[in-house]
């Protein structure tokens, strides 16, 4: 029988007896592992140092920076490591700079940070003389997810989860009395309006103006015991840390640490991409009917009542991407500075005479922490779902999953190690 010789990897050739040509080339799985580790060694470590390698003392007098790094030659070969039952690794040396912020003095020194295990040509690691492999993980992508269930009366009930790569989760839910609650890091729930007050919408009027007098938020306000931003901050602190003494400063610092601190909260690049894609107002516009004129440079390009088909949406995207509908909104600037959202009005599918406000986040944001713009947009999407606008997610769909390869897994472990080192350095 006729066959063709086909290269498989760097060293082997395989006989292929297939009569039909494969439409897809098989990936070199070994090369994927090796390229991922190479990315970690060349770029992943640098990203961690750029993100976390700026350590300041509690007094603010001294600042330590982690700069360039290099790998020294491994002490032993792969065979020697197996024979001696030790780890095949290379010393990682880092150039550090210590700044004295009072005198302006700068000291530079190369330090030994640790032994970094090296990947062999086979895509494995030698750990204590034994050959080991890091298995890629299939995980849920960081994003904003919305789910729908039917209660015992057949009424749709929505829930939402705001999930980062690392950090505190937010979960939205609605009870039988149409009151919206939020759970912060899966703890006891608080009314949604309490969180909105903490993020800058201090009064009832601020909340209702922002979300267009939404009836669900009106119900929630009635259950909310707080009346302004300061009370909301303290209420959230007491829910998350019951029994601890409460001050306004500690309440603010807690929210900053949980959501707006690079050390504690990280969306990663994929998370920011998914957040911006999900919270973009274009995700909710298809098959809706415009409830406003779209006027650009004094010219009406779309009129009130226009049905948003695929063709209309593609044209509308051009104006939205150019900044149409962007507004600055009220936020708690002590927590965050991102105060831009994008707004458009459509008619409700459930009540064709009712105008509904669609609010998206700032698509120009490229930070890896949560922003108040993200929170407002995620709440708006949740309220839109209750009006029949938008769509829920199938959480187990592979489109909502991603693969964490060896390079990213190692980078995450390095982040944990640098964060621990940062605490020790500050204390000393």
Report the location of each language-model feature.
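N-terminal non-catalytic structural scaffold regions of very large proteins
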Residues: 1-428
């Amino acid at each position: 029988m006729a066959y063709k010789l086909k290269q498989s990897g760097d060293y082997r050739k395989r006989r292929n007896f297939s009569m039909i040509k494969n439409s897809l080339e098989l990936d070199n799985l070994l090369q994927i592992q090796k390229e991922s580790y190479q990315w970690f060694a060349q770029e992943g470590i640098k990203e961690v140092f750029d993100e976390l390698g700026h350590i300041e003392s509690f007094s603010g007098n001294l600042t330590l920076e982690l700069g360039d790094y290099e790998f020294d030659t491994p002490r032993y070969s792969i065979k020697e490591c197996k024979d001696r039952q030790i780890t095949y690794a290379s010393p990682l040396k880092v150039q550090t700079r210590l700044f004295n912020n009072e005198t302006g003095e700068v000291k530079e020194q190369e330090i030994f940070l640790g032994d970094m295990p090296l990947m062999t040509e086979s895509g494995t690691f030698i750990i204590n003389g034994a050959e080991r492999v890091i298995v890629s993980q299939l995980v849920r992508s960081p994003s904003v997810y919305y789910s729908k269930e039917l209660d015992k009366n057949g009424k749709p009930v929505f829930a939402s989860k705001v999930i980062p790569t690392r950090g505190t989760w937010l979960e939205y839910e609605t009870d039988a009395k149409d009151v919206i609650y939020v759970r912060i890091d899966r703890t006891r729930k608080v009314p949604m309006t309490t969180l909105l007050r903490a993020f800058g919408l201090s009064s009832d009027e601020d909340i209702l103006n922002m979300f267009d007098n939404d009836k669900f938020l009106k119900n929630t306000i009635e259950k909310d015991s707080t009346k302004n931003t300061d009370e909301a901050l303290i209420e959230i602190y007491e829910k998350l840390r019951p029994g601890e003494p409460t001050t306004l400063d500690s309440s603010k610092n807690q929210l900053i640490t949980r959501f707006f601190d690079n050390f504690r909260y990280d969306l990663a690049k994929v998370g920011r991409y998914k957040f911006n894609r999900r919270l973009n107002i274009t995700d909710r516009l298809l098959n809706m009917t415009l409830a406003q004129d779209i006027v650009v440079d004094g010219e009406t390009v779309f009129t009130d009542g226009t049905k948003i088909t695929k063709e209309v949406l593609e044209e509308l995207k051009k104006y939205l991407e150019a900044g149409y509908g962007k507004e600055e909104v009220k936020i708690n600037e002590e927590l965050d500075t991102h105060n831009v959202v994008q707004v458009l009005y459509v008619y409700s599918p459930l009540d064709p005479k009712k105008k509904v406000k669609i609010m998206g986040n700032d698509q120009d944001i490229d930070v890896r922490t949560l922003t108040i713009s993200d929170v407002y947009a995620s709440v708006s999407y949740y309220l839109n779902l209750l009006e029949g606008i938008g769509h829920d997610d199938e959480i187990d769909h592979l489109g909502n999953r991603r693969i964490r390869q060896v390079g990213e897994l190692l980078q995450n472990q390095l982040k944990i190690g640098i964060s621990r080192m940062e605490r020790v350095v500050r204390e000393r």
